[in-house]
Amino acid sequence: MATTRSAGGAATSVDTGPAAGNSGIRKLSTASVGGIAGGVAPSWQSCYYCTREHFKSISDFVNHLRNRHCTREGGSFVCRYGFNGVCASLPLDGVSDRDYDAHVAKYHVNQHTREMPPEWGVYSAAQNLPAVLNDPSRGKQSNLFTKKWGEHFVERSHVPPSPRLPDITHADFTVYLGSIGKRYRWHERRQQQLERDKPLENGAQGAPGPGTGGQTPTHLSSVPEIFLKSQLQLHHPATFKQVFPNYMQTSASSPESHQQTGRQLQEQLSHYLDMVEVKIAQQVSQKSAAFFHAMTTQHAILAEMEQAADQVRQLRAALAELHSHSVVDSFKVLRFAQRRQHYNLTLDKLRLMATVHKTQPMLQLLLGTQDYVAALDLIGTTQEILSAELLGIHCFKHLPMQLSEMEKLIDKMLTTEFERYAAADLNRPLTDALRETDSVCAEEDKLVAIVMGLLRKQNFSFVQAYQQEAIATIRAIIKQLLIEVLARSDSDQEISLTGHGEQALELTLPEWIALLQRSSQALVSILERIKTVVGIMQQTADAAVGAQDAVNLIDSEAFLSPGHHEQLKNQLQQLLQAVCHYCHERCANIVSPQSLERSSASEQELFQLSEIVDHFGETTRSICGVASVPLQLALKVQASRYAQRFHSERKQKLSLLLDQERWRQVDIPHEFQRIIERMAAGDYAKPEMGNLISNGAGNPVLLVEGKQPYTLVSASLMLIRMLYEYGCSAHRLPLLASYHARNVVDLLRCFNSRSCQLIIGAGAMRVAGLKTITSTNLALVSRALQLVLWLLPKLKEHFQAMSGYETIERDYQGHIKEIENKIHGIVSERLAAQLDAWEARPPIPSQTFRHISRHLVKLHEAIAGVLPEAQIHEIYGVVHRNFKDKLREQLLKLNVNNNGGPQHGVVTSELTFYMETLRTLKALPAEQLDNGILEEIWLY
C-alpha cells in the first residue's frame, strides 16, 4: 500500500498489491476528494481534450485514459494525456502496467482542477487590426505605417455618462440602512458572544480521559448519544452493551483485569459527568440573571394565581346560576316550539299521504273526461312527491311502479285513441266534408286533448301514424273511384284491382279524364281536411310551447321545449308535403302513358287535362307550400305525345302538298289574309279555319302589313295555316309552347329543304310532272321563302324560343340567294350565247340584239308579278353586268375600237336599242338607265 498526500492535504491510498497485478482498473481511495480546493470539481469528472466527455466515477475516467489517451509499445505503456498527445509528467518513457496505474492516480486523478489557459487567437488582441485599417469613418492617415501596434494604436475617445443612469448618493441608501441596522447590530452582539464562549471551550480540553494517554475534548459531541436520551433503560441488552462496551467479553481474563476495566469505565463515565456539569455551569452562568429574576418573581406569580383561581370559582358559580334560571327555561321553550313544528310537519305529511292516496281515483276521473294532460301532470307531480317528500314510506313502496305502469297505459291509450280518431275523421263521407262551414275537422276538442296528451308524453310518432292513415285513405278513395268508373263503363272486362290498379284498366279517354277530375276533387277535399287537422295540431303545439300569439288551449304551464316544438313543426310540414306528393303520384298514374297508351288525346281533351292538373297543383301548393312534380311530369309526357302527333300529321301533310305542288300562283282567300293579319298582331286567340279554295273568290296577292304584296302558291298558304295552328295551340296550351317551338323550326326546315330539292334540284319535274323549271316557279318559291322570313320574328316572339330560329333564317336567306343566282344565271347564259354569234355590222338592230331584248322581256314577264321591284332591280343589275362583261370580250375578239369608225357606230346603235328595252321594262333603277353604257363599254 503506497500512501501519498495531495496538495490540499487529502490522503490518497493506491492499492499496489499483487492482487491487482492483471486488473485493468486499480482501486483508488479518495477520502477527501470532495474538499479539494474549497469545493472545486475534481479533475476526473471531465476530460480536457475530449469534448462532451463526462464521468460519474474514477474508474470510468481511468478506463477512458487507458482507451483513448494511452499507447502500448511492446510491454510498456506510454501516457498521451496532454497537449498534442504528450503527457507533461511522463512525456517519453514507457512504464509497466502497475506503474502506469500509479502515474494516472497521482498526476491525473488526484490533481486539482485547473482551468486551461485559453489559446491565443485573432480575437485575443487588444485591437482588431482589419477593423482599424478598414474603418470607413476615417480617411487616409499619414502616420499609419509609423505607429507602433498596441492599445494606443487607435486614439481613445471620451464616452460621456449615460443620461439614462441617475447619480447615486449616500442618501439613496438611508432607508435601507435604517431597516437593516437593527438586525446588523443584533448580529454583531451574537458574534461577540460566540467569541467569548470559544476560550471557555478550548480551555476545558486538557482533562485526561480514562484509559487514554492523550487529551480528550470536553465538548458534548464527545459524549455518546445514549447518555443524552431522556430515558436510559439499562435492562435492554442493546443499551447495556453500548453503556458497557467490551465488559466481561472474555472468560479467561483475571479478576485484576476486570477491576482495571471497571475503574477505567468508571473514570470515563465520571469524565462524561464532569463535561455535562461544566456545560450546565456555563449555561447557568449565561442565564444567571434571568434565573434570579424568575426566582424573585415566583412569589408574585403564586399570589396572582390564587387570585385568578378565586375569580374562576366565582365565575363558575355565576354561570351555574345563569344556566339554571335562563338557559334551561329558554331551551324548554325552544324544545316545545320545535316539537310543535315537528307535529305540524307530521300532519302535513299525513295530509299529503291522504292526497297521494286519492291519486288513482282522480286519474280515473281525469281519463274519463279525456283530460290527458292533467292526468299526466298528476302522475308526474305524484312521482316527484314520492321521490322527494314521501321517500321511505312503507305503504307507498309499490305506488311509483303502479304510476309508471299507468303512465305507459295512458301513452298506449293516447296512441290508440289518435289512430281511431284519425281513421274515423279521414274516412268520413266526402259529402259531409263539403257541408262543413266552420271547420272541416270534426270533434276538435277531442283531437286537441289527444294531441296535447301525446305532446305531454313527447310522443311525436303520431305524426307518422297520421301520415300513414292519410295515405291509406287516399289509396282507398282512388280505388273506390276506379270501381265506380268501371261500374259505369260499357266494357265487359273483369274488375280486378291490385296494388295501384290504375295501370291495368282499359278505359276511354273521356273516362280517364272524368276519373282524374273526380279523383282530384276528392283528393282536394281530403287534403283540406288533413290541412285542418294539421293546423289544429300546430295550434296545440304552439299552446304547449307557450307561444305569445298561440291560442290558450291548456290550463297548465307550457311543457314543450322550443327544440321539440321546431321538430314537430317540421314534421307536420313534411306530412303535408308527403301527402300532397303521394296524391300527385296517384294522379300521375292515371295520366301516365301506360294508362292512356291506347288513347290519343285531342287538343280539347289535353286542355281539360291541363286545367285539372293546374287547378290540382295550385290547390296542393296552397296546402303544403311546395309544388309537386309527378303529375306535372305525367301531363308533360301527354303534351309531348300530343305535340309529336300534331307535328307528324302536319309535317306529313306538308310533304304531300309539296310533292303535288304545281308551283303556280293561286288567289289568296280572305281567311288567309285574316290569318296573316292576326299573326302580324300576335293574336292567336280566335283561329279561323276554312277550306282552302285555290280558284275561289279572293285577292290575287297576299298583303302583308297592308302594303307589301306576296304572290304565293298553295303549299305556302298551307304552311301559313299550319304555322297559325301551331301558334293557336301554344296560346291555348302554354304547356305545348316549348314542343311547338322546336316543331315549328323542324317544319320550316322541312319546307325549305324540300322546296329546294323540288325547284333548284328539279325534283318537281319528276314528282309533279313539270316539263321544266321556269323563272316564274323560282320566283314563287323565293317569294314564299321571303314570307317565311317575315314571319320568323313574330313566331320567335310568340313561342319565346331562343335557339334554332337564327339557323333557319340563315338557311332561308341562302336559299333565296341561290334562287336569284339561278334566275339571272339562266338569262345570262342565254345572252352570252347570243353575243357569241354577234358581229358589228348592219342591219341595226341586229337579230342578236332583238333576241336579247326578247329574253329580257320574257324574264320581266315571268318575275314582275311575283317579286318585289327591289329584287327585280337586283336580278337585272346582275344580268346587266354580265352582259357588259360578255360584250367587252366580244368587242376585243372582233377588234372593234372606240375610234369613231363604222363598227363603233354599229355598237353605239345596238347599245342604244338595248338600253331602250331596259327603259321600257324599268328593269333597273332610274339612275342606271342613262346612256352611260356607251362610254363604260369601252373601259377595259
Swiss-Prot record:
Coiled coil region boundaries: 299-325
Chief place of localization: Golgi
Keyword Phosphoprotein on entry: yes
InterPro entries: Vps54 (IPR039745), Vps54_C (IPR012501), VPS54_N (IPR019515)
Family: Belongs to the VPS54 family.
Keywords on record: Coiled coil, Developmental protein, Differentiation, Golgi apparatus, Phosphoprotein, Protein transport, Spermatogenesis, Transport
Domain of life (superkingdom): Eukaryota
One GO CC term on file: GARP complex
Transmembrane segment boundaries: none
Protein name, as recorded: Vacuolar protein sorting-associated protein 54
Biological-process GO terms, alphabetical: acrosome assembly; endocytic recycling; Golgi to vacuole transport; protein transport; retrograde transport, endosome to Golgi; sperm individualization; spermatid nucleus elongation
One GO molecular-function entry: syntaxin binding
Native source organism of the sequence: Drosophila melanogaster (Fruit fly)
Function: May be involved in retrograde transport from early and late endosomes to late Golgi. Required during spermatogenesis for sperm individualization.
Positions of the UniProt region annotated as Disordered: 192-218
Alphabetized Pfam families for the sequence: Vps54, Vps54_N
Residue numbers of Phosphothreonine PTMs: T30
Localization in the cell: Golgi apparatus, trans-Golgi network
